[in-house]
Curated annotation (Swiss-Prot):
Molecular chaperone; assists the folding of proteins upon ATP hydrolysis. Known to play a role, in vitro, in the folding of actin and tubulin. In yeast may play a role in mitotic spindle formation. The gene is CCT8. The keyword Nucleotide-binding applies. InterPro entries: Chap_CCT_theta, Chaperone_TCP-1, Chaperonin_TCP-1_CS, Cpn60/GroEL/TCP-1, GroEL-like_apical_dom_sf, GROEL-like_equatorial_sf, TCP-1-like_intermed_sf. One of its GO terms (molecular function) is ATP binding. This is T-complex protein 1 subunit theta. Keywords: ATP-binding, Chaperone, Cytoplasm, Nucleotide-binding. It holds the Pfam family Cpn60_TCP1. GO terms for biological process: chaperone mediated protein folding independent of cofactor. Belongs to the TCP-1 chaperonin family.
Length: 540
């Protein structure tokens, strides 16, 4: 009798190198464990007192941040189920710009309670059905928990932006929120604006209190060439091509039998630059913004005719400056027409903190671009402030869609937990899934209490007692004193709805996966970064 060795599942079906994990092998439990791992990484980074993480990417660049979106972008995650959750958080970042951490944490907690229900014997379809019913009830309940509205964007916008920024930069949220609101007020037109019209320029030195908002654009570089006197040029015309006056240094050679022909090429080239610069000056050109480097010969004639050159390598910045001054980007070589040139009110070159910056200031109402000049002591601090500003600007985009506000600081989660638990309209085993769904919301106030250094069990008991009363809707966690009171912290309804909905969708998608089939990774073997010990080619 011959001996038969056991083969891998589906070994005769797929090509060599495939791996398969089915539900019989515990695929769902493994998926939950993978999601729990990524959720535990981001869990302690939530809230105003959230901890920072040090992440070193594959290029060796270090990130010190508590921003979930930044961490997920820099982490190289290969697990296919966790990637589903990351896609949901990126969708939240794209649509609302905030609460990306909430999507991961809620989905991880939903899967934790679902794992317990699976061990009790509930079917996956029953858990998904119960979660969907509870999610529909939550969407209706959130509309009933609205406490305030942003009626006027000039006066009420600050109270909605402060909590968003405080989650990233606690203690300086007043200063940053004022910068964000001022910048949005400059670019908003008829109740709407484009988030790309608000730029952030980081300048090392000084403190955050010296940051300012400029109507127009600020470039962290000084002009090229010798023409640098750019202080307050009124009503100047700006010509903005992508490539203009760019000429590589070329070497010319000739034999002794052709001396006259040898002089034609450089002389013709000089005449071309002279003609272009002279005609541009006649048309009124005072400023030139090329999208690439400028050759030495072209820069010589531009300096000769008093044309100031500022190189803008970013094509996105070129498009924005076109919107500010009304210029047309041109790829051709030659003098621009009056219709192709733009106008600007004030152009000035200033020194901020030892760095030379060029400011395009447009005081007219037609300009829809604003720049926040951020000051700080370290580069890491400036990066964190920039992320907080981005979250604040994107949160205003969510307020434009829906101006209703919810109580924050863990108040709305405890209230949802109370109302979902009292939801008794569904009989049978689905009631277990609905109550477990409600229990998952308790993770938010627990994390807020733990990261702020307080006893989470004591605070949770006080929260439940406060929300048991009819007047306790706005009772939240005061992270400074550790008490439960009306903290005046507000959350945006549209952002909260989107985060919960995406977390539930991602949870149901992960629970419905009963098998994972993975192909062999393409490419050859990865070469070692360092020589192995004992290698004959290694220097002793």
């Amino acid at each position: 009798m011959s001996l038969k060795l056991p083969q891998a599942p589906n070994s005769g079906l797929f090509k060599q190198g495939y791996s398969s994990f089915s539900n019989a092998d515990g695929a769902i439990i493994r998926n939950v464990e993978a999601v729990r791992e990524i959720a535990s990484i981001l869990l302690t980074s939530m809230g105003p007192s959230g901890r920072n993480k040090i992440i070193v990417n594959k290029l060796g660049k270090k990130f010190i941040t508590n921003d979930a979106a930044t961490m997920l972008n820099e982490l190289e995650i290969v697990h296919p189920v966790v990637k589903i959750l990351i896609q949901a958080s990126k969708q939240q970042e794209f649509e609302m710009g905030d609460n990306t951490n909430l999507v991961i944490i809620l989905a991880g907690e939903f899967l934790n309670v679902a794992e317990k229900l699976l061990t009790l014997g509930l079917n996956v379809s029953e858990i998904i059905q119960g979660f969907n019913l509870a999610n529909k009830f939550v969407m209706k309940t959130l509309d009933e928990l609205v406490v305030e509205k942003v009626e006027s964007f000039e006066t009420d916008l600050l109270k909605a932006v402060k909590p968003v920024i405080a989650a990233k930069q606690y203690g300086v949220e007043d200063t940053i929120a004022k910068l964000v609101v001022d910048a949005v007020a400059l670019v908003m037109k008829n109740g709407s604006f484009n988030v790309d019209n608000i730029r952030v320029v980081k300048v090392m030195g000084a403190s955050l209190s010296q940051s300012q908002v400029v109507k127009g654009m600020v470039f962290p570089r000084e002009p090229e060439g010798t023409v640098k006197n750019a202080d307050q040029i009124q009503s100047c015309r700006v010509y903005q091509p992508h490539r203009y006056f760019h000429h590589r240094n070329q070497r010319y050679s000739c034999s002794s039998t052709m001396p006259r022909k040898c002089l034609i090429s450089p002389r013709a080239k000089n005449n071309s630059w002279t003609s272009c610069a002279r005609k541009s000056t006649i048309q009124g050109l005072r400023w030139l913004l090329p999208g690439s480097s400028v050759g030495e010969l072209a820069l010589h004639y531009l300096n000769k005719y008093g044309i100031l050159v500022l190189r803008v390598p970013s094509k996105f910045d070129l498009r924005r400056i076109c919107q500010v001054c009304g210029a047309t980007p041109l790829p051709r070589l030659g003098a621009p027409t009056p219709d192709e040139m733009g106008e600007i009110d004030i152009i000035e070159t200033k020194e901020i903190g030892g760095d030379r910056v060029t400011i395009f200031r447009q005081d007219e109402s037609s300009s829809r671009t604003a720049t926040i000049v951020v000051r700080g002591a370290t580069q890491n601090n400036l990066d964190d402030i920039e992320r907080a500003i981005d979250d604040g600007v994107n949160s205003i985009k969510g307020l434009i869609k829906d101006n209703r506000l919810l109580p924050g600081a863990g108040a709305v989660e405890i209230e949802l937990m109370k109302r979902i638990t009292a939801y008794q309209s569904t009989p049978g085993l689905l009631q277990l899934a609905i109550k477990s769904f409600a229990k998952a919301f308790e993770v938010i106030p627990r994390v807020l209490a733990e990261t702020s250094g307080h006893d989470s069990s004591e605070i949770l008991s006080k929260l439940h007692a406060a929300h048991a009363e009819d007047t306790g809707l706005r009772a939240g966690i005061d992270i400074d004193s550790g008490e439960v009171a009306d903290t005046a912290v507000l959350d945006i309804l549209a952002t909260k709805k989107s985060a919960i909905d995406l977390a539930v969708d991602a949870t149901n998608t992960i629970l419905s996966i009963d098998q994972i089939i993975m192909a062999k990774r393409a490419g050859g073997p990865v070469m070692p970064q360092q020589p192995r010990p004992g290698n004959w080619d290694q220097d002793d």
